[in-house]
Amino acid sequence: MMSAFMEKLSLPFRAVRWACILVRQGKTRLLLADSWTRLYKAWMEGLYALTYRLGGRLVGPPNVTIRLQTGHPVAYESPDHLIPFGTSQNNSTNKKFVMSMRARLQRDFPAQTFGTLDLGCSGGQLVRDFLDLGYVAVGLEGSDYSLKARRANWPALAGKHLFTCDIAHPFQIHIDERPAQFHLITMWEVLEHIETARLGQLFDNIVKHLAPGGYFVASTTSEPDVHEGVDLHQTKWTNAEWRAHLAKSHPQLVWTDLGLAYYQMVRHNEERSFLTYRRTS
């Protein structure tokens, strides 16, 4: 497992290799979109630093105790655990998304302490960003790779705000020993990794942990993702197929428009497919 220093050192080489692969595959549109997204994110990082860090608006984590109850602490059967590709590399965030959702939650839930849950959190940076704003932020990751490698935010947040868990099995998060409900639940490049037969339980977990009026935001893709001869994507549905499935299986989730472009989301793919929902009562 790579040290944090070696992981950072390898980033430029991985980026060049990935760019060459996209060019060979004729996916220059995706390469250009990703390059623009990276520039935009860097600009937002600067704006965020001026507005929040230098402005003294980062209050830090609230004083709460978070406990995860699960009979499946690791997704041992998942290809992502057996071949830890994305979970060993990703630590994504987008300060525009963070600032936009902060404004939206303040409007919709005034005078409340906000809660956010990132499912498939990888390195946990999105959790870290919401913690800095004073939110009750939690991240669940199916693989224990980042925990064991002590990468990204896991050394500081493991067992307190970051936990390993197979999210396709029943679980319950407790905050100060009370069942938790969150105002925002996110999944970035995760849904397609879930076995189709387990989607029902997954969305039962999501609805149970989503406060009435709360938001569910996810990215999806219908493309394969093959590593070491194994396709890590187990449910390759189009955006329309996901929406049809949710309309039938979990009608309490209602489609909503966040008014965000693809480069303002935390992660995106060539399809620019996103699921943006609110929970009814």
Model feature map: region roles:
Residues F5-A180, L184, A197-F203, T235-E241, ...:
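Conserved N-terminal segment of class I S-adenosyl-L-methionine
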Residues L184-V190:
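A short beta-strand submotif of the Rossmann-like class I SAM-dependent methyltransferase core
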Residues E189, T221-E223:
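Histidine-centered beta-alpha loop that forms part of the nucleotide-sugar donor binding/catalytic region
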Residues H193-I194:
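A short His-aromatic
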Residues G200-P212:
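A short glycine-rich, Lys/Arg-flanked "PGG" loop and its adjoining helix->strand segment in the class I
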Residues G213-T221:
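Conserved beta-strand signature within the Rossmann-like core of class I S-adenosyl-L-methionine
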Residues D225-V230:
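A short acidic, helix-capping loop that chelates divalent metal ions and anchors anionic groups
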Residues Q252-Q264:
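Conserved S-adenosyl-L-methionine
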